[in-house]
Every structure is written in structure tokens, then in C-alpha cells.
Amino acid sequence: MDVRTRTEEIERLTLTPWATFSDESRGRQRPEEQDPIRPVFQRDRDRVLHCKAFRRLKQKTQVFLSPEGDLYRTRLTHTLEVSQIARTIARALRLNEDLTEAISLAHDLGHTPFGHAGERALDKLTSGGFKHYMQSLRVVDKLEKDGQGLNLTWEVRNGIVTHTKGIWAATPEGRIVRMADQIAYVNHDIEDAVRAGVLDPATLPKDCTAVLGQTKSARITTMINSILAHSDGDVGVGAEENEAFLALRDFMYATVYVDKTAKAEEQKVDKVIGELYEYYLAHVDQMSNFYVQLAYQDNPERAVTDYISGMSDEFAIRTFEDVFVPRKWHVL
């Protein structure tokens, strides 16, 4: 018996009956030989962790555009916090941690530079619109490994594309990630907003903090405990905690996410993304080689969207400067 088979047997003995079992996966788009050590979802987790798009998350905005300081969240730190919360819940409910972690780590791979401001900019430019969760799926299916994709399992791909809104994931692990994503971003965005000076913690709705707690740690713990207490046969959450959490999220949308400073910077994002988009549509051959090939194989608009959405904040700004800002001449 190889290590993978033994691990799958341990899953049968330890996971809850409504968990997603590795040996019952619906499979991959392209059949592969099984790994002798790792079950399929662990293998997916590893592929995501080692891919280029995952590394780029470290220089992609979470909420505040190009923040200075070492303590602000990036898209990468957000992803890691989502993974931690989701795995905590999965372990407590005896669900599949490997699947939970794979979805968590992959859920934002398609995010644009400059956070949701960049997403909105590309959404306006791209025919058919742009949604980061659909782009995340395109990244793992098509763009990684020079067009081969990561060939992830159906369950991970389903969790990626359903992590934010609309229809819920088909697996309980995917549904956990969706909840963990919201728990993570609302709470760490509060912390970052306070640090940035755009939010006074005393203004947080008292009816929300009375239920959820005064601190980030307390609020996260409250939500986790509520999920654990109301999940039996499926993932759920208590009505009181959920109502308070949604009200707190609405408060953040009404205050921090529409802060005048953030909105002023968003206009600059529109310009950077818009100018780069039009430039590369007219100069397809100046993109990286892979995207040039993609433009001729697929279509230029799709390739330009892929190229820009994959940029980090820093790379997008540097590229904009290289293309549109005159270079200095040193005259002796």
C-alpha cells in the first residue's frame, strides 16, 4: 500500500460523512496518473503554492492602493488569513483540510493590480466584463505553466469560481472558504483602515460589536464558533452573528471602501489601467512572449486583459512610466 492510499484510508476513518473525500474527486480536465504520496487535493494545494500567480499576490493591493509601511495587507497576506480561518473551521468540523486549503490559496489568483479598483477598471474596458473569480479560474486552467494550466480537480475549480457571490460551492469545503474570505477581509480591513487613519474604531456600530466583539480576534473567534455550532450535515452560521456581521460589512462599504482619499486614487487607477489597455491593444507585440502568442491564438483583447490583470501594482506603475513618462536624459 502506498502513502497516498493509506492517507485516503485515514480520511475515511477521521473525516465526517459529509466531507469531500479525496478518492471520490470528480477528477481533472486531463487525466493524470495518481501521485504515490499525495492525494489529489494535496497535490492541487502544492501546485497553487508553487505557481507564478501566487507569488505575484505579494505585490497586489488588498484595499489601500500602494500603502507605505510593513503592516498593511496585500492580496497574499489576505489569502493566507483566509486559509488559516478556513482550515481552522474545516479541522473542527472534520472536513477535508487539503481541499479547503487548495481553494483558499487559489481563490484570488486572478485578481488585478490595485485591488477591486483595478477590477472595476478592467470590467469597464473588457467586452463581456471582467470578474476576478472567473479570471482566477482562467489562470489555473489556461495561463499558468505557459498555457498548460495547473489541471486542478473539479472540486477546487468549483470552489474558486463560487467563492464570492452567486451560487454556492458544491462542496462544504468550498462553502467554508467563501465564509472565511468574508470574515478575513472585513476584519483585517477594519484594522488596516484604523492604521491608515480613515476609521475611528469608536465609530464601529455598537450593536455589531456587542454581538461579535470589540477586537479583530474576538470577532473572528465569534464567527468561527457560530459556524461550528450551526454546521451539521452542511455549513451554517447563527442568525444573530450573521446579521451582526452583515451589518458590519455594510458599514465598511458605506465608510471605508468609499473613502474620498481611496476614491481619488481610484481615478488614477482608471487612467493607468485604461492607458495600458489601449496601448497594448495597439502594440500587441510589446507584451511578454506568452501573451503575444496568446493574442494570435485566442484574440488580442483577451490576451491584453490577461496580461494586465496578471501585473502586480508595482509592475503596472513601472510599465506605465516606461510607456508614457519621458525618460531623463543625462547631458554632460
What are these regions (language model features)?
Residues 1-79, 83-89, 96-97, 118, ...:
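Histidine-centered, transition-metal-coordinating active-site segments
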Residues 115-127:
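A glycine- and small-aliphatic-rich helix-loop capping segment at beta-alpha/alpha-beta transitions
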Residues 110-114, 184:
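Short active-site segment of divalent metal-dependent hydrolases/proteases
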Residues 101-106, 179-180:
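Short alpha-helix carrying the canonical HExxH Zn2+-binding catalytic motif
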